[in-house]
Amino acid sequence: MSEKNAYAKSGVDVEAGYEVVERIKKHVARTERAGVMGVLGGFGGMFDLSKTGVKEPVLVSGTDGVGTKLMLAIKYDKHDTIGQDCVAMCVNDIIAAGAEPLYFLDYIATGKNNPVKLEEVVSGVAEGCVQAGVALIGGETAEMPGMYGEDDYDLAGFAVGVAEKSQIIDGSKVKEGDILLGLASSGIHSNGYSLVRRVFADYTGKELLPELEGKQLKDVLLEPTRIYVKAALPLIKEELVNGIGHITGGGFIENVPRMFADDLAAEIDEDKVPVLPIFKALEKYGDIKHEEMFEIFNMGVGLMLAVSPENVNRVKELLDEPVYEIGRIIKKADASVVIK
């Protein structure tokens, strides 16, 4: 018995792994950017930081996954957008620190290598990288029979960006009177899906719920997370924002206070929040308390900016999209987030 046959009998298909690598090369090539060194398949990804032109570089890193949204991708057998979610979760955190994301690495673990499915996943990763302007410089696909079911997989990512030291955004510049501007989310993004799956557990995904304006439920649930890099970078370069909040798990209540010091608070005008139809549907069909929705979901705002009043018009001018003035920074009395 050859070693290859012995390994195959244990559930690991080496040939399928090689096929995955060949299939994804064209997708990786789409993400090329200045600074990338080496070739796909090396032991380590390399990036020449001098190509960024940053004078005092500070590296900023982020890692994340997409949680149980993956279970819906598997349930509905749609795998070409979940990779974008993974990229978004990492690069949006990096941009919140005032850094430009540079490169990305992915990790896929599965019970059985399915080259077609894994190519779809990586195509989504590559699309996310293109949208974020980052290079996909490496990754790992691990076939782990016994750890995962044959149709199951997990996906995680790691991104690195660079900030000019003087432009780091850490909340220290946010002050009382700053205006809170919201940029729209594309949907649920990648958080709260354990609750989402419970609410819609008995649905096929093909339903046309009246709240969803003609879209099938599964398409709304799998709408990929928006990537904010290209919207936010010009604002950072011009030093127009004092704070940035990526609204992820924990919704407004947990993420907004991460933007500023402990002696400040955010006052949110609920009427100005562009609540998306899916959140109204979740509240209705899940019998979720209205105030709890803001503790779980982004409610239609995926990125929040704290901006000095005199810079608001310039920010709106640079952003080629609707911008929502949803609140302001106040002195903290009790709660860190006050929704009125």
From Swiss-Prot:
Pathway: Purine metabolism; IMP biosynthesis via de novo pathway; 5-amino-1-(5-phospho-D-ribosyl)imidazole from N(2)-formyl-N(1)-(5-phospho-D-ribosyl)glycinamide: step 2/2. Gene3D superfamilies: PurM-like C-terminal domain (3.90.650.10), PurM-like, N-terminal domain (3.30.1330.10). It is found in: Cytoplasm. Its EC number is 6.3.3.1. One of its GO terms (cellular component) is cytosol. The keyword Cytoplasm applies. InterPro entries: PurM-like_C_dom, PurM-like_C_sf, PurM-like_N, PurM-like_N_sf, PurM_cligase. Keywords: ATP-binding, Cytoplasm, Ligase, Nucleotide-binding, Purine biosynthesis. GO terms for molecular function: ATP binding; phosphoribosylamine-glycine ligase activity; phosphoribosylformylglycinamidine cyclo-ligase activity. GO terms for biological process: 'de novo' IMP biosynthetic process; adenine biosynthetic process. It catalyses: 2-formamido-N(1)-(5-O-phospho-beta-D-ribosyl)acetamidine + ATP = 5-amino-1-(5-phospho-beta-D-ribosyl)imidazole + ADP + phosphate + H(+). The keyword Nucleotide-binding applies. Signal peptide: none annotated. Its main location: cytoplasm. Belongs to the AIR synthase family. This is Phosphoribosylformylglycinamidine cyclo-ligase.
